[in-house]
Amino acid sequence: ITDYDVSYLENSGYESDLGLSNIFAYEEYVNAFYSQYGKKVDKLSFLLGLRYEDSKQEIDQRTTNQFEIKRYSDWFPTLNLSYEFSKMESITFGYSKRIQRPRGWNINPFPRRNSVTSLWRGNPFLDPTFTNSLEIGYLKRYKKFTINSEIFYSNSKDNNVRVTEDTGELITVTGGDDDELNPTLLVPVLETYPINLSENTRFGGVLNLTYTPSRSVRLNGSFTLNNTKIRGEFKNQNFDSDNTSWNARFSSFIKLPFDISWQLFGFFRGPSETAQSRNKAFGTVTSAFQKNILDRKGTISFKISDVFNTGKWRYETFTNTFFREGEGQWREPSYVLTFSYRFNDKNNKRTRRQKSNDLNFGGGDDERIFND
């Protein structure tokens, strides 16, 4: 529920400003049941699953008097196969059907102004996205080295994408009377909102390598390459696009002298492009140190997030009538020093796990800094 009301006192009482107030109620009901059956025969194992879901959404935007009820139901099968050539080598196959429901901010139709020239609004008529996925994986373990690879294919219907349009409104933007490099301009106001396009197909592979030369050193790296094809049309505009993108991760855990643990984590994402937007490449590196003190009852941790201040994403949005550049950053580089003390020795290990959860790298899938 969003309950944000801006009212002004008039002669007859308080009157809401419909341009600023946002009173939005959203309820979602999901009823489901599922069953599973698995078995292992010699080196072959399988797991079959079937889930049924019935969903209901109630969307009530009271400021703009928009009310919508949506219901949908479907079956979601799952199949997982695994064959072990040996304890050190195996191959897997998986099929699944999944549903991705739109989040509340994607369906709230009340406009939100990100800047004087940029608006965002949700789409109350947004449907969920249904995805069928196939995956084939191969795992090979050596004494100090592990290779984990995967090839994947997915096809999504009613894919959720964002579109940007010119509202026709113009805003005067000026750099000041003495700023000759930034003269006064009339800038169009752009509005972005999500829609369902017909189809999204992804095909690619993942390679994950782990190297553990000793108990004091553990190195891990992964690389993902995928090709995405989007097919769809909206308001007589073709949104077809073909794009190949990549991302990479690495992490390391090293035991240093004086009982100091050091962990390093990095994430890099290559450029990507759709019919209306272009995202530039970016990457970020985070580092942390930890030392146990006071007979291992106390722990000092020091974490540096985004060491090189490179965790900024830059993007471009374009059509035949406008071109926009933007830049964003979750947060600037930060430095966190933490001290913890464990009073109960019997629960030391459990406490260390809880504290390490507080020190994560943040953003997307959280990465734990230290493992017990």
Model-based region annotation:
Residues E15-Y34, D127, Y142, T146-R218, ...:
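Outer membrane beta-barrel strand-and-loop segments of large Gram-negative receptors
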Residues T224, S241-D372:
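Conserved C-terminal beta-signal and adjacent last beta-strands/turns
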Residues I1, V41-K43, Y52-E58, Y95-R101, ...:
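Transmembrane beta-strands of outer-membrane beta-barrel pores
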Residues K39-K43, W75, Y83-K87, F130, ...:
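Outer-membrane beta-barrel strand-turn architecture
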Residues S35-K39, L79-Y83, L126, I136-K140, ...:
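Residues on the lipid-exposed face of transmembrane beta-strands in outer-membrane beta-barrel proteins
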Residues E10, E28-T63, Y72-T78, K87-S133, Y153-V187, Y211, R215-N227, ...:
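Surface-exposed extracellular loop regions of Gram-negative outer-membrane beta-barrel proteins
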